[in-house]
């Protein structure tokens, strides 16, 4: 008799599952469902809202610890937006960029909690964010400059003979922003969680094989703990990188360079 053993894939943790669904005959048999990615994004939105409430200082002179943390994030993102765009236009787009940073950061941090779900590891979410940013920047460019916006694809000092080729390259590069912005975020979160899952399973198998192997497994366990700290840093860095590049795209649309 053959014994079958279930093999767990590191990709199982990223599977989108229906948690609750209901058919609505009154709405053309539309199926309404709540998935794990929708649930965790909703949780992230509530956490962001609750964090803002905790950080409200109620006009007190001495700030609380939540106010200090929010002011630190506020000052950091404000500096990034103003430096990337400019003092005048940066103020207008700062609220959107700050909200975008907090949303991505909280989703990244939720993904670090054991047995939770990493929403930002899914390309459907990150590509939706990147497409929205690039499309918004493109619409903004046409609104500000009209057809002159196409001059963005013409490099300065370009020889006339190379103009068609370089314009094509610049246009493809512009379209690639939609993919690269979302791909960078999802790929970093996805690869980090997969590596942690593989190393954790490997370490568990070693440490559960006996007392000697348990002692030997302390070394990879220490590495996993250190790597988890690195993943926390990546959660912050990738949120910041997404905002920096988004600001850069908006600046290109406003200033055509």
From Swiss-Prot:
Signal peptide: none
Entry membrane topology: Multi-pass membrane protein
Main function: Mitochondrial membrane ATP synthase (F(1)F(0) ATP synthase or Complex V) produces ATP from ADP in the presence of a proton gradient across the membrane which is generated by electron transport complexes of the respiratory chain. F-type ATPases consist of two structural domains, F(1) - containing the extramembraneous catalytic core and F(0) - containing the membrane proton channel, linked together by a central stalk and a peripheral stalk. During catalysis, ATP synthesis in the catalytic domain of F(1) is coupled via a rotary mechanism of the central stalk subunits to proton translocation.
Protein family membership: Belongs to the ATPase A chain family.
Record keywords, A-Z: ATP synthesis, CF(0), Hydrogen ion transport, Ion transport, Membrane, Mitochondrion, Mitochondrion inner membrane, Transmembrane, Transmembrane helix, Transport
Highest taxon, organism lineage: Eukaryota
Main location: mitochondrion
Description of how the protein assembles with itself and partners: F-type ATPases have 2 components, CF(1) - the catalytic core - and CF(0) - the membrane proton channel. CF(1) has five subunits: alpha(3), beta(3), gamma(1), delta(1), epsilon(1). CF(0) has three main subunits: a, b and c.
Name of the molecule in the record: ATP synthase subunit a
